[in-house]
Amino acid sequence: MQAIIDAEQSFKFPVLVGDIGGTNARFSILVDSNAEPKEFPVLQTADYATIDEAIQHAILDQTAIQPRSVILAVAGPVDGDEIDLTNCDWVVRPKKMIADLGFEDVTVLNDFEAQALAVVSLEGHHMEQIGGKPEEAVATRVVLGPGTGLGVAGLVCTRHAWVPVPGEGGHIDIGPRTERDYQIFPHIERIEGRVTGEQILSGRGLRNLYLGICAADKITPTLETPVDITSAGLDGSNPQAAETLDLFATYLGRLAGDLALIFMAHGGVYLSGGIPVRILSALKAGSFRAAFEDKAPNKAIMRDIPVRVITYQLAALTGLSAFARTPSRFEVSTEGRRWRMRR
């Protein structure tokens, strides 16, 4: 599947690709279109005041390779010459990067746009399937990622290429359905009166859900962090934490199923980010898939749609690297999202 591409859409190598999340930042360098990526240690965004400082000290100072092009995936909308990141204090200023760091070309995409590019670029062993049939080769796909926030994107196949469809799906309304839900939801923290997907299906959402369960049960919470809640839920040492994971899996299944119906995603639903990998055993226990398929009158359709957990930490970099190597494989608009050195 190849689309016609002009020189304006290609990238000059070496190319630095970066996945900038709310907590972690990952980078690698492609020396040319055929080379294996040169990887660097994962960075904590809180350890650096700016993204420029992080790139200079953790990347450029550690290699003799000077990238000519940069492709970044960031958690947040790409709008204007100063790009604020969601859940992180960094601000991406492409013009300043070109002036100060020696780059010729900087492109900034949405982080889940990169995840969408990855789902048709990863190897099979980088994913674990939870139910459904094998995916249809050129069918629409959906990526859903609970992590620091909740990312959502689609991936649609045209006649010539894959088209990522990023959005802000993590901020849709999510509501109660069962009697137990109605006991818990009054205690879930709201944003201007709304319970959004991100208020439950994220790291902080996991804690919100746990606190809601404790409030519904009229007990004092004893676990403080999402990590503590996850650990206690997985080993069964805390009943409320165990229910938190079960309901998290259920609510994630409901939302994933809704998105699968919206996109008619016979190419599959892909779960990315650190949380699905960490709670993989809970996702495979049954509640997730049951909620995913419970979409009458379309249960038969839902039974066939595969769900895959992306287990590879560098998935977004894989997607960005695929775009850098073969941009003709994808239709990605860079208008207003690409900056070049003036000559």
Swiss-Prot record:
ATP binds at G18, D19, I20, G21, G22, T23. The keyword Transferase applies. The keyword Cytoplasm applies. GO terms for cellular component: cytosol. Transmembrane segments: none annotated. InterPro entries: ATPase_NBD, Bacterial_glucokinase, Glucokinase. GO terms for molecular function: ATP binding; D-glucose binding; glucokinase activity. It is found in: Cytoplasm. Keywords: ATP-binding, Cytoplasm, Glycolysis, Kinase, Nucleotide-binding, Transferase. Gene3D superfamilies: 3.30.420.40, 3.40.367.20. Belongs to the bacterial glucokinase family. This is Glucokinase. It comes from Brucella melitensis biotype 1 (strain ATCC 23456 / CCUG 17765 / NCTC 10094 / 16M).
